[in-house]
Amino acid sequence: MKVRVGTTNPVKVRATERAFLRTFPDREITVEAVSVDPGVPPQPVGMEEVHQGAKNRAREAWNRGSYSVGLEAGLIRVGDVYVDLHVAVVRDPKGRETVGTSPGFQLPPDVTEEALSGEEVGEVFSELVGVREIGKRSGAIGVLSNGKVLREDLCELAILMALIGLETSR
């Protein structure tokens, strides 16, 4: 089974492979990373923007006969605060799309403030903790949770939630 993921970020590529292996344990899975333009700002804010980025990534990566995955992280307002979460769009070989999300978590207020002014959460956090390209490693969640939850876990969960939609739409 061929799966194309609309990113070259190794965390998202590994999460895609993990989710598909869990969903299709008897199939051989080949994941191909595809560089695409998500068509949204580098730091999406609001569910509409985050979903649009994931959908654009899935559509740009898709080829008939294969699955594709689009993953986008962003800030979503919940009451008076923002949470960081991932949205996944999975497109099946026939072009049907389903959506899933990861759990969300609250960022420190200063990080949220900088992100809302246009800075990427990953870049702000990289500077804060002195780890280059943290979004391609444990992510902000890895630091905040002391390694209990990693960005790869959040990405995998979002994809698994989207794959449930494909199972129930058959």
Swiss-Prot record:
Its EC number is 3.6.1.73. Homodimer. Binds 1 divalent metal cation per subunit; can use either Mg(2+) or Mn(2+). It comes from Methanopyrus kandleri (strain AV19 / DSM 6324 / JCM 9639 / NBRC 100938). It comes from the Archaea. It catalyses: XTP + H2O = XDP + phosphate + H(+); ITP + H2O = IDP + phosphate + H(+). InterPro entries: ITPase-like_fam, Non_canon_purine_NTPase, NTPase/PRRC1, YjjX_NTPase. Mg(2+) binds at residue 37. Phosphatase that hydrolyzes non-canonical purine nucleotides such as XTP and ITP to their respective diphosphate derivatives. Probably excludes non-canonical purines from DNA/RNA precursor pool, thus preventing their incorporation into DNA/RNA and avoiding chromosomal lesions. Signal peptide: none annotated. It is an enzyme of class 3 (hydrolase). Gene3D superfamilies: 3.90.950.10. Keywords: Hydrolase, Magnesium, Manganese, Metal-binding, Nucleotide metabolism, Nucleotide-binding. Its cofactor is Mg(2+); Mn(2+). GO terms for biological process: nucleotide metabolic process; thiamine metabolic process. Belongs to the YjjX NTPase family. GO terms for molecular function: ITPase activity; metal ion binding; nucleotide binding; ribonucleoside triphosphate phosphatase activity. Substrate binds at residues 7-12. This is Probable inosine/xanthosine triphosphatase. Disulfide bonds: none annotated.
